[in-house]
Amino acid sequence: MKTVSVIIPYYRKIKYIKKSIDSVLNQKFKNFEIIIVHDDPRNKDFDYLLELKKNNNKIRLIKNKKNLGAGFSRNKGIKLAKSKYIAFLDSDDTWKKEKLKSQISFMKKNNLDFSFTSYDQIDSEGKKLKTVKAPKLQRYDDLLKDCRIGLSTVILKKKLINKKFKFSNLKTKEDLCLWLKLSKKYKLVGYNKNLSKWRKMKESLSSSTKQKILDGFRLYYKHEKFSITKSIFYLFLLSFNFLKKNYLR
């Protein structure tokens, strides 16, 4: 049995996926499996992923019959995982070599169910932009207005994910939606060690902003059952803190 299952949902990131996979394969900690969930049935990138998987029994490649989105693809990967711990990595992000060894050791030493770490923000070419430090703890009330948890820094015990606690079908904010649910029952503990690199991609500002606003409102109104007024209030706080964290140096 492997100690860690690394879940990577894949959707049209052919420029970066090899770097992401290599950053896992080059870990000092070796007792892991990689589960790549290919979420674009019409795209030919699957053949490229097969080549990357070739002759490597650490990699499992799953192909969705239809596009499920990143959240549901992660749920599928988790369900197939055979490890005690689950780690998440997006297909354009990377890890530092000591990531798994250091973070798993931290979790075992402190008997933790969930941890996240500090990370570097990098641009599309890999140039460092800034470092985002992990707070000691992310409580429910903190998360409502400012999420400091980088998805590709998270490791949690598989037992935490079930029918009640899993990723939603939101196109964005699906990770925050899960963190909020988990924070009501578990401690989400930060490890102030820089172990990951999060790639800040250039995207259509108008389309991405609209989607994030819609999903943010759905998060509070539909999933957290807030009133319209309360949902708008927290959406404003979350958006302000996101802009402050990601666009102000």
Where are these regions (language model features)?
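Glycine-rich, basic loop-to-helix element that forms the pyrophosphate-binding segment
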Residues: 64-81, 102
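Conserved donor NDP-sugar-binding/catalytic core segment of glycosyltransferases
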Residues: 98-129
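Conserved nucleotide-sugar donor-binding catalytic segment
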Residues: 131, 135-211, 219
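Cell-envelope/extracellular polymer assembly enzymes that use nucleotide-activated donors
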Residues: 2-5, 23, 33, 177
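Acidic donor-binding segment of Leloir-type glycosyltransferases
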Residues: 21-63
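Short, well-formed alpha-helical segments that are part of the catalytic scaffolds
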Residues: 10-26
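The conserved acidic donor/metal-binding loop of glycosyltransferases
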Residues: 90-94, 118
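Short aromatic/hydrophobic "clamp" motif used to bind/position activated sugar donors
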Residues: 86
